[in-house]
């Protein structure tokens, strides 16, 4: 028997729609869905995932910056006429790493 046929006992989506329509028209101003219950463990898990996303975002941004500087150095190195620019880019790159090492040493 076809459940979507128009004759007989129909278990189509229309009957569910009628149920939802009756519930929505019942005059009850409160929504049927309740707020989810958050346990302390759940809030700790949420804080952990937010922390992980922040740390992961900073690490990804740092990797993108390092990759961009490596690409810039390789492009400058590929053109022979720009030796001073190449040296300057290398010095900037090394300066960044030295600054990072200084920050880690202070930590």
UniProtKB/Swiss-Prot annotation:
GO biological process, one term: mitotic sister chromatid separation
UniProt keyword Cell cycle present: yes
Annotated localization: Ascus epiplasm
A cellular component annotation (GO) from this entry: ascus epiplasm
Keyword Repressor: no
Superkingdom to which the source organism belongs: Eukaryota
Alphabetically ordered keywords of this record: Cell cycle, Cell division, Mitosis, Ubl conjugation pathway
Chief subcellular location: other
Disruption of the gene: reported phenotype: Abnormal spore wall formation. Abnormal spore wall polysaccharide composition during sporulation. Irregular spore wall thickness.
Assembly and oligomerization: The APC/C is composed of at least 13 subunits: apc1, apc2, nuc2, apc4, apc5, cut9, apc8, apc10, apc11, hcn1, apc13, apc14 and apc15.
Annotated function: Component of the anaphase promoting complex/cyclosome (APC/C), a cell cycle-regulated E3 ubiquitin-protein ligase complex that controls progression through mitosis and the G1 phase of the cell cycle. The APC/C is thought to confer substrate specificity and, in the presence of ubiquitin-conjugating E2 enzymes, it catalyzes the formation of protein-ubiquitin conjugates that are subsequently degraded by the 26S proteasome. Appears to play a role in spore wall formation.
Protein's recorded name: Anaphase-promoting complex subunit 14
């Amino acid at each position: 028997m076809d459940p979507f046929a128009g004759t007989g006992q129909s278990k189509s989506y229309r009957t569910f729609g009628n149920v939802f329509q009756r519930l929505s028209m019942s005059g009850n101003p409160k929504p049927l869905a309740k707020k989810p219950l958050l346990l302390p463990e759940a809030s700790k898990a949420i804080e952990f995932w937010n922390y992980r996303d922040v740390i992961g975002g900073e690490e990804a941004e740092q990797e993108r910056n390092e990759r961009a500087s490596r690409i810039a150095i390789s492009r400058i190195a590929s053109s022979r006429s720009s030796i001073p620019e190449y040296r300057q880019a290398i010095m900037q790159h090394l300066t960044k790493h030295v600054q990072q090492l200084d920050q880690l040493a202070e930590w």
